[in-house]
């Protein structure tokens, strides 16, 4: 017996689509969608491949979102088999780069649409796909580019809004469907340089040690409460230092500068602007000279309990018997960009235990189950 989800997942894994190379994955998917009657549009930018595909003319829109790109393989010698030759293992897994993150989700989405539209050729709502080859890398010309175009069109009333979005990121922890992401923390990065006065360590009155200054600043940053108020959905905002650089290499020289990189993972209880202002205030209070380079890599988003989360919990319970955990844990995803469109958004995909690792794999039985979950959500939301 053939398994169409497995076959499509294998076809996608064979394509060496390391960011930002799509390697023809969108053509494979687009061909399948076009046969169903989808209207296809490529919104490529700066060498990144992006696909926007739509079906239907009326009713609420359910969007499937994801990425065709994968992370590098690492040392090929460590793999049990070629990462771009899909391998079915004896214990029932599909192995290959992208098997879990997230070519299996893409295959499940496409096949779910095929089966759904075969049974309901005229659904009560619309379906769309937003796919990119730039999620694992800089993520500056992928989903961002499509969202920017959709924002322009929606402002001009030339494009209908997305009502519900399912991102196929591998959200599950131990069993398919046990965790569904309903939000993600924002991520703010800073490169802070503390300026002092270089000199000989034997003459402290003639130097201003920036290492000491940076240490005081870091201690204050660690001890700061960054949130306006407690949040029922997210943990408190976290601050972490990831790199520190200082010194000339000599033991008798106080350096002129100390630089460190740091990151805030923040919830909807604060904003990047508020964090930046608080840091500037701390520096002023300490009376030090410092320069800062800021980089906001993602705003936080949250889908509160509503139509999509309710439907998702019910479909998972009906098909698997699991009471799913609606979570905001984990890192960032392209959901942070799509959420700007104002839609209800979740992330639902396979078990994430092996993502980005050697011998990445997904349970073959889960491919069928995931397809059925996606199909069940289409039936409940736009059927």
Residue ranges and their predicted role:
Residues 18, 69, 78, 136, ...:
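Catalytic metal-binding/acid-base residues of hydrolase active sites
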């Amino acid at each position: 017996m053939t398994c169409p989800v497995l076959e499509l997942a294998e076809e996608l894994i064979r394509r060496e689509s390391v960011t930002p190379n799509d390697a023809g994955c969108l053509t494979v998917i687009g061909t399948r969608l076009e046969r169903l009657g989808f209207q296809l549009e490529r919104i490529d930018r700066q060498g990144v491949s992006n696909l926007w595909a739509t079906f239907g003319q009326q009713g609420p829109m359910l969007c499937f979102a994801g990425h065709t790109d994968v992370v590098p393989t690492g040392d090929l010698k460590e793999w049990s088999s070629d990462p771009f030759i899909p391998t079915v293992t004896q214990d029932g897994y599909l192995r290959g780069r992208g098997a879990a993150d997230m070519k299996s989700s893409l295959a499940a989405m496409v096949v779910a649409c095929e089966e759904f539209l075969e049974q309901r050729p005229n659904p009560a709502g619309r379906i769309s796909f937003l796919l990119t080859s730039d999620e694992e890398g800089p993520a500056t010309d992928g989903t961002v580019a499509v969202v920017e175009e959709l924002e322009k069109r929606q402002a001009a009333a030339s494009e209908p809004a997305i009502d519900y979005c399912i991102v196929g990121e591998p959200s599950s922890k131990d069993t398919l469907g046990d965790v569904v992401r309903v939000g993600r923390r924002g991520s703010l990065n800073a490169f802070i340089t503390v300026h002092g006065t270089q000199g000989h360590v034997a003459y402290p009155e003639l130097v201003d040690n920036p290492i000491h200054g940076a240490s005081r600043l870091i201690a204050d940053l660690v001890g700061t409460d960054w949130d306006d108020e407690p949040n029922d959905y997210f943990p408190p905002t976290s601050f972490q230092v990831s790199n520190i650089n200082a010194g000339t290499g000599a033991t008798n020289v106080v350096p002129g500068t100390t630089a460190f990189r740091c990151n805030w993972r923040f919830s909807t209880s604060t904003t990047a602007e508020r964090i930046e202002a608080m840091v500037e205030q701390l520096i002023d209070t300490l009376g030090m000279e410092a320069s800062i380079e800021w980089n906001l890599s993602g705003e936080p988003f949250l889908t509160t309990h509503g139509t999509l989360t309710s439907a998702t919990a019910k479909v998972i319970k009906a098909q698997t018997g699991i009471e799913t955990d609606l979570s905001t844990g984990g890192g960032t995803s392209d959901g942070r960009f799509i959420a700007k469109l104002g839609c209800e958004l979740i992330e639902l995909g396979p078990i994430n235990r092996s993502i980005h690792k050697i011998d990445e794999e997904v349970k073959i039985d889960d491919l069928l189950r995931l397809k059925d979950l996606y199909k069940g959500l289409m039936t409940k939301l736009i059927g």
